[in-house]
Amino acid sequence: MASATDDRSVSTTRPMGDATRDAFGRALEALGADFPDVVTVDGDVGNSTRTEWFAKKYPDRAYNVGIAEANMVGVAGGLASMGKTAVTASFACFLLNNAFDQIRMAVAYPKQNVKLVGTHAGISIGEDGASQMGVEDVGLACSLPGVTVIVTSDGAQTRAATKAMLEHKGPVYLRLGRPKAPVIYDEGAAFEIGKSIRLREGGDYTIVANGMMVAMALDAADALAKEGIECRVVDMHTVSPLDEQALVDAAAETGGVVVAEEHLAQGGLGSRVAQFLSATTPTKMGFVNIGDTYGESGDPAGLLEKYGLTPEKIADSVRSLRG
């Protein structure tokens, strides 16, 4: 049975690279000298979120408040009010759920320069089970006005997004995964908050995805091309704010849009895309997500298969639009 750190923990033909949490940790450590106002606030899980790499290099800029996520976010908000760029990280389920009131009142409402980093997101964390799986985190973050929400797909993009996050003034939620991620981008590939990336051209349908589902979207598009169905693939890494022009173009120029994400059906990328397109450029839509349910313990590949987060399910969703 594959473990959550095995190279082949997701179903894709693409080579595997760094886990996005690892890429974030190394990027933060490397960027410390360029961003002297950055501090980290940890909830005693820095060895898992990888903030400990920054803390070991800059111990006088790192704070550990213990297993107390609400207090952790409050401290981060206070540091930001004193001019610091506060990076605070925990498992996605604990950060967004346990500290939501503090995120709302100490970060989002006052527009503090706090960077919230949720690791171990989705069901792909594997054996740890439902209590540890952040499957509603994007929806919670997107519900807060003014919070930028980013979901990266591979190591190279995460390194670029970490730098962009530190440069951005205001609250950011960065969602990261536990397992190794399929390689999508070359090192140094351009990344701009709020600007999606078109990875594949196609005039029949569009697949919009983020996170590890980007690799599966590309695999699905390759499979569909063999059937004569050409799909555009868009990496919508920023969930809030959406790249609205890319969505209008997709709806106007192709025959329908399928949204794939490792998140609950409600509140995440699919909900936001559907809400926007229904009001601006109505089109046929399909959705591939976890559904309206919690996860369970199991190996990552098996869980992704069970919950329908596969290239095959994405391809099936595209085919369903043809009727």
Where are these regions (language model features)?
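Thiamine diphosphate
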Residues: 1-175, 180, 190, ...
